[in-house]
C-alpha cells in the first residue's frame, strides 16, 4: 500500500513535467494533461487538475485517483480527460505515465489527419515508428481512449484527430520524451513537405531501430527527456 510520502513524490514529478510542457510550448494556458502511476500502488494515479494554469499549479493541486476514476485525495477536480488516462492504464499494465499535449505543429498534422511517417531516426527510437492519427472523438469521453488503443498498440504516441498528441511510456519520463519528439517531428515534416515529398526511413531500418532502441527502452526505466537526433 502506498504512503503519503509516495503520493507527494508523484505529485512533484507530475508538476515538474507539467511545467516543462509549458516551457517547451507543448501546451498553452490550461490545455493538455499529465499523469503517472503511483509506483508502489498500480491502482492509483497522480493526475493534473482541471482548468488550472500550469504556472500557478502546486504539488497539492495534483489529484490522486483510482484507475476506476474515483478521487482518493485532492481538493480540485481531475482533468476532464480523466477517462483517457484511467482507461489506458486499465488496458495497459505496462504503461506508467501518460502525457497529452496541444502543441502547434502536431495539432496541425492532427487536423489534416495525415499522421507523421517515419522520417527521422529520433522519432522511430522514441516512439517506435511513424505516428498514426486516431479517428475523431469528442474530448473528455471514454471513446477517445477506445479509439487510441489500436494506434498505441505498438507505438509510444499517436495523434488525436482535430485535437492533439497522446504519448505513453513505462514512466512519465518516457511519455514526456515521446510527446516532445512528436512535436519536433511534426514541425520538421510540415516544413519539409511544403517543398517536396519527404523520404521515409526504409522499413527494414525502422524495424532495426525499433528492435535495438525503442523496445528495450520500455524495460530500462526512467529516461532523461531528449529530442533524439
What is the role of each PLM region?
Residues 1-229:
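Glycine-rich flexible loops
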Amino acid at each position: 500500500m502506498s504512503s503519503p510520502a509516495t503520493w507527494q513524490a508523484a505529485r512533484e514529478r507530475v508538476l515538474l513535467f507539467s511545467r516543462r510542457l509549458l516551457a517547451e510550448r507543448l501546451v498553452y494556458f490550461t490545455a493538455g494533461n499529465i499523469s503517472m502511476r503511483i509506483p508502489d500502488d498500480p491502482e492509483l494515479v497522480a493526475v493534473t487538475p482541471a482548468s488550472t494554469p500550469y504556472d500557478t499549479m502546486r504539488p497539492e493541486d495534483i489529484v490522486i485517483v483510482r484507475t476506476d476514476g474515483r478521487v482518493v485525495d485532492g481538493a480540485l477536480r481531475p482533468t476532464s480527460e480523466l477517462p483517457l488516462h484511467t482507461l489506458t492504464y486499465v488496458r495497459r499494465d505496462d504503461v506508467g505515465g501518460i502525457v497529452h499535449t496541444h502543441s502547434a505543429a502536431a495539432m496541425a498534422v492532427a487536423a489534416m489527419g495525415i499522421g507523421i511517417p517515419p522520417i527521422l531516426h529520433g522519432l522511430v527510437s522514441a516512439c517506435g515508428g511513424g505516428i498514426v492519427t486516431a479517428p475523431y472523438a469528442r474530448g473528455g469521453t471514454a471513446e477517445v481512449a477506445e479509439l487510441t488503443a489500436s494506434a498505441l498498440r505498438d507505438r509510444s504516441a499517436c495523434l488525436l484527430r482535430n485535437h492533439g498528441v497522446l504519448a505513453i511510456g513505462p514512466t512519465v519520463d518516457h511519455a514526456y520524451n515521446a510527446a516532445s519528439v512528436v512535436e519536433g517531428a511534426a514541425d520538421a515534416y510540415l516544413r519539409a513537405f511544403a517543398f517536396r515529398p519527404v523520404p521515409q526511413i526504409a522499413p527494414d531500418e525502422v524495424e532495426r531501430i525499433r528492435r535495438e532502441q525503442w523496445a528495450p527502452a520500455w524495460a530500462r526505466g526512467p529516461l532523461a527527456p531528449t529530442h533524439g537526433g
